[in-house]
Structure formats: C-alpha cells, structure tokens
Swiss-Prot record:
UniProt key word NADP: yes
UniProt name for this protein: 4-hydroxy-tetrahydrodipicolinate reductase
Similarity comment: family membership: Belongs to the DapB family.
Any one of the GO BP annotations: lysine biosynthetic process via diaminopimelate
Pathway involvement of the protein, from the record: Amino-acid biosynthesis; L-lysine biosynthesis via DAP pathway; (S)-tetrahydrodipicolinate from L-aspartate: step 4/4
Gene field: dapB
UniProt keyword annotation of Kinase present: no
The species this protein was found in: Chloroherpeton thalassium (strain ATCC 35110 / GB-78)
Subcellular location, record wording: Cytoplasm
Superkingdom of origin: Bacteria
Amino acid sequence: MKIALLGTGNMGKAIANIAKSSGKHELVAELNAATTLSTDAFKDADVIVEVTAPDAFLTNLDLLLQADRPIVVGTTGWYNGIEHVKAKVLEANGSMLYAANFSLGVNIFFRLVHEAARFIAPFEDFDIAVSEQHHTGKIDAPSGTALKVAREILSALPSKTSIKTELPAKGKIQRDELLVSAIRLGSVFGQHSVHIDSSSDSILISHTAKNRQGFAQGAIEAAEWLVRDGGQKGFFSMDDFLNEILSSPEKK
C-alpha cells in the first residue's frame, strides 16, 4: 500500500515508522503544515493518512477530496462540523474513515464503558464521570477520545443527557450532565478514566497509552481496510471497521 502522510508531528512520525518497518507499505509523500498542497502531491498514493490539526484538516478538505484517494483522518477537534464534513465526502463520492483514536485497546475500552453504562442505567444510586490526561502539547481539550467515551455513555445511560466540559464557577453540576474533565501534564501520552460511584462502592475503568504505537498501527490497519477491493466509498468511523472485523468468521 502506497501512503501519502499529511502531518509530520509526533503521531505522523509514529505512523511513518510503522509503515516503513512493515515491509509491505511505502511512504510516497510526507507532507507537513509548511507544504504548499496540490492534488499532485497525492498522485502516487493509494491512501492519504491525515494527522495535522483541526483547522488545517478543514482548510484542506476540498483539496483532499479532489485528490480522489481514500482518506484516513486521525485529527480530532473538528467533530462539531462532522455533518458538514460527511456531506462533503458523500457529495464528492469520496472515501473517508475517521477515528477519535485508532488504538485497538482504546476501542475495547469504548465498548467496556458502553456496557458499564448500560449495566448501571436501572440503578439511580450510581453516578458517572470521565477524566483524561495528556501532555502539555496537546491542542484540544477534552480530547477527542474523551468525548467519544462520553458519547458512548450518553448512548447507553438515559439519565445523562448532555456533556459538561467544565464546572460552573458557582453552583453545581446537574444530575443529567456528564462531566468530562481534562488535565495537561508533562509528557503523558494519554490516560482516560471513567469513574462510577454509588453510596456503597466505586468502580474505575481506565486506559493508559504507553506510547503512540497502538494508534499508529491501528491507523495503518484502518487504511488497509479502506483501500481494499479498489477502495470503499462512503463516510466511515472506526466502529464500521471494527464491527466488520469482529463479525468476520475468520477473525473469530
């Protein structure tokens, strides 16, 4: 698979290292924010892997679609405009897969959290909140992964109807609000926790990234899935990829 990598920060470097060491993939372009982009930059690629920044992704969206290549998007922080992006992709008959986090471990974590929220739903005594920690260089807060965790909870727990990303200066958080808090500290790769509490006990579900390798490997595997059979058209999430993998008989 020939990969055009857009974004050469820490995550881009991790993806490049995985691709180069795989023995079966080739990096045909490594582009950063200083690069003047044109569709020619992607002409030799089978797939574009995009890991820049929210503003850069949205600015480059039309050009990426004009390149007529499947696009894997690891950038987060743009999900408020997700319906706009989806409409653009479908209008262009394009191919895009996005994820808040490509790590297999994190995606297992998402499903564990969803089930935990479903289990506590009948019991009014339980409350739930989300916290995350990342390095001080991370741009968006809360992280896209934390917000994905929050959406998993909301989809399974009717008592929570909205996400609150900061506490009010005065007053208290409402029972139907799900608090998602963020800490920026040193060089922490990423830690996400779900806190469940009742008058009798507490439950903590947590995922800690040891490095960026899991994310990078997952992004490559998602790209392989997206380009198979000449390329799949549509707007996909990591759930689409994983659901097909898990339902495939040869994977069981």
